[in-house]
Amino acid sequence: VGLMIDGVPSVGAIYDPARQELFRAAIGLGATCDRRPIRVSQTTELRNSLLVTGFAYDRHQTTDHNYAEFCYLTHLTQGVRRSGSASMDLAYVA
């Protein structure tokens, strides 16, 4: 759930029922997971990074599904995660 004020994303919350975690963020207040402050990872090298992605529900809908790029990057990173939820993928960037 999010709130935009004058076209600017200002407040947001994401709940992960599987892990019972609540992510919240607001402009000027930072972000939290279960009230603990979180921040974006400081990892700078691709080989130490976790690749998070998703694919279209119906792979036959489009021929440009970035599969070749995904395969290439898979071998350059620490690992791959496909959660099925874009909002959770973004929350776990921190």
State where each predicted segment sits:
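DPxDG-like acidic metal-binding loop motif
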Residues: 1-32
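Short, solvent-exposed loop/turn motifs
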Residues: 9, 37-39
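A broad, low-specificity signal marking well-ordered, structured residues that form hydrophobic/aromatic
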Residues: 23, 36, 49
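Short hydrophobic/aromatic-rich beta-strand segments that constitute the beta-sheet cores
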Residues: 31-34, 53
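An extended, acidic
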Residues: 39-94
